[in-house]
Amino acid sequence: DSARVFKTTDRGETWSAAVTPIPSDSMGGITSIGFIDHVRGLAVGGNVGRPHEHQENVAYTDDGGATWTQAGEPTYAGAIYGITVVPGTGIPVFVAVGPGGVDFTADLGITWSSLDTRNYWSVGFASRSAGWAVGPEGRITKISF
């Protein structure tokens, strides 16, 4: 099965579903979505039960989530737990985290580069110079672009 993204434009009165190329099963699916504007975004996820396998776990939309296309894979194997957009970079930069590390893309998910190879659970940015990734055992890592 393929993971789906649900969208509403009327505050939850009605919903539409869009199929993504990200596989979905009891151990996997979409974990996070990030948008740079109202039409362009990335959905990420994967199967947490396959931590050592590269997975088709990134999808791109350029029509507000109506359709999704397979994007490139991050440098690390396993699922992606979170994704966010770095504000104020000029060109869109997404940062993704998972048990394989922290990666970023500056071309809407086509190619990825590694920032760290340690396990992380979540990531967020207040500005291009104030981002944090968090992981097990109290790990907090500051990230700047």
Task: Indicate where each model-derived feature is located.
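Residue-level hotspots at or immediately adjacent to binding/recognition sites across diverse folds
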Residues: D1-F145
